Amino acid sequence: MDTKNKRFILTESEIPTTWYNIVADMKNKPRPILHPGTKQPMKAEDLYPIFAKAVSDQEMNQTDAFIEIPEAVREEYKKYRCTPLVRAYGLEKALDTPAHIYFKNESVSPVGSHKLNSALAQAYYCKQEG
């Protein structure tokens, strides 16, 4: 009988305190987003009319690997981040890889946590800016 843990659920104290920005760690950075009017690389300021300043700054950030999650957002995450992390032992075996592969089981959240994770943060920053 297989006794390995397959499902992992974070406690409230284990909820991340930072977002990970993969671009900061990429050796080859993605091509810049081009301004639709000028066709020149966009700056964070170009996004301010559309998004909250903090969201725009984070979107264009290529240097900080970790971005602090505001306490108020983390408190809201505690209500909604209950989706389990599942270890894909079968896939690891099929791929014959020593890597540990995990996936989030979003079937327990009707809207999918990625939507709430993003929406809560965007609403927080918009509220901060008035």
Where are these regions (language model features)?
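PLP-dependent amino-acid enzyme catalytic core
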Residues: 1-130
